Amino acid sequence: MVSATNTVNSGVPPNPAASIQAERAASKFDPKEMHYFLEGGEERAEKFKQMMQQMERDPILSANFQYYDLTKDQQRELTALRIDRLTRYIENESFDDFNKRMSLMGVFDPQLSTRLGINLGLFVSCLKGNGTAEQVKYWAMDKSAVYMRGIYGCFGMTELAHGSNVAGLETTATFDDENDEFIINTPHIGATKWWIGGAAHSATHCSVYARLIVGGQDYGVKTFVVPLRDSNHDTMPGVTVGDIGAKMGRDGIDNGWIQFSNVRIPRYFMLQKFCKVSSEGDVQLPPLEQLSYSALLGGRVMMVLDSFRVSARFSTVALRYAIGRRQFKAGSASDDKNALECQLLDYPLHQRRLLPYLALSYIISASAVKIETTIESTLENLDKAVEADDMGAIMKSIDSMKSLFVDSGSLKSTCTWLAAEVIDQCRQACGGHGYSAYSGFGKAYNDWVVMCTWEGDNNVLAMSVGKQIIKHILGVLDGKKVKGSADFLNNTEQYLNEEPVLRSVDDLKDLKKVLLAIEVAIIRVAYQASQTLKENKGDFDTVGAEMVTLSKLNAHHFMLSEFLDRMDSFESKQLVPYLESVAKLYSATIVLEKFAGDFLAQGVFPPKLNGELNSKHIPELCKEIRPNVIALTDSFQQSDMMINSAIGSYDGNIYENYFGVVKANNPPSKTKAPYSGALEAMLNRPSKEERERFEKSTETAKILSK
């Protein structure tokens, strides 16, 4: 951190570092032990710290404050340099470890992790999800796509006129049986591939989603590997690409557009793990085509982990600032000339504003690790089943995939929405200094909010999850059973007739009862939506709002359930009371308070308890957590390099650090701006009379009026 180097003072300067150091010294638990909980075990936690240290010491990868002053072109150049550097890492570590490295990079340079993720997380995952074993080996390994040597892939799904409606994509892949080739074509402007990360300048190949046309028949959207650039990095004949230009954020990514003008590719460039086309033009359709979209799951799962780390980063910044920053004298101290001003976090309102986001960060951690391990095992089992052509195992994997689609969809949408809220609300809690680029909030917010849109628009994803929950409810009422994380829906008939689950403040403190309350709310909202459906002839658009609510509640149920399971099995029992406090605050504020309308409408708790929730329960929890805030944020173990905020460093020296960064990046010796000429022309312009040559002056009037 750069010091402001102010050595002469005529008064006593503020000392925010002392406040933070004092609270750190008073910590009642070891943040290192808590970090093991957050990362899902000591081994994962140690790997996290090793990788963080490597990147911090790497002169190319390490973050700094110049990052916030870079132009679009400078961001892209830096991103390219960092990608080149990271290829050396991927050649020397397992893919699992490199994925962990990408996750950490997403904290301080999300555009870098995205550029890598486009190739590894989308292009290569598309190969694995849709290609045969031979195709995966050829493109990913033999052609070195996984090492970004020779091939750098992009993911060509979205079009100018279609995004969420994948089935409506209009790029065509027409089979030419005479030449054993597919002809890839963009029939009109709406079918232009759009927002394609890496397409503008980087990608050599694209996994193109296009309509399979054989013998004049449309077989729907399939995937094809289409070369974009040759070995000289010049575009291939018939391929036209362009840069989309400046975006709200992530300018380090060269998002582009692509148009194909009758581009020919060999038949075997079609990925044929499921759908197959023979040289004679015979089409073999997959029995369960939805499996081909498994490539999207990895990205959604990664976003849950990103939500945890980003929320942890900015709740840490805001809370350190709130402890170091003092404003006004509160209570009896207001008349004491020698009393210090009050720390921001000692104001009850500030606690209500920030502490729920600290709690949320903790809760997301458990579900992030759980969903990550679940997808790894599920996809592995599916691949084995498909390779062995074992229909029994395939059907079992499909059941797991369906559950995973629901859980990952609700978690991706809910967590990315919440993380966006965390960044912005924490920024507001830091006042004017939070608006500085060097606080990190501004760029992070602009970079983050695309997460609410790509790889499944959040509202569309949420509605698909809610729709599935409603279908489950109808199935249960018809005698069917639900498997997986939503098996509580099997209690539908019982929960429809239950009395209020939460009746007292003591019930609010019982996390198992809160979990039950969420289950009851989900069942009752879903049942009510099913009745609305009947009244509207099964039109799901009439229950869009309810479907989004169901998805959010499903995510909160998953997160709280996983957190409680991990807490129960955690070996360091001395940390459990602190974890319970965090979970109670999360459930009280992020769940019960935010969804109070639904809980009240469904009779899950009475109106009187809602009043006690706000006036008594939440303030008590904030007061309980307040002394441990520094220890709880230190437990994230994010270094100053990862946090990269001038007002959120570990030492707490807010003003010296912030002033030092400002001076270093904007040297006060440069007193004239590049546009000083325009300012000087304005300030030193002649008077209006002089510019009019004094032709309208009194003297001129006297002369001309004679």
From Swiss-Prot:
Chief site of localization: other
Basic and acidic residues biased stretches: 686-699
Subcellular location per the Swiss-Prot or TrEMBL entry: Peroxisome
Record key words, sorted: FAD, Fatty acid metabolism, Flavoprotein, Lipid metabolism, Oxidoreductase, Peroxisome
EC number assigned by the record: 1.3.3.6
Pfam families: ACOX, ACOX_C_alpha1, Acyl-CoA_dh_M, Acyl-CoA_ox_N
Family listed: Belongs to the acyl-CoA oxidase family.
Protein name: Acyl-coenzyme A oxidase
Source organism of this protein record: Debaryomyces hansenii (strain ATCC 36239 / CBS 767 / BCRC 21394 / JCM 1990 / NBRC 0083 / IGC 2968) (Yeast)
Encoding gene, per UniProt annotation: POX1
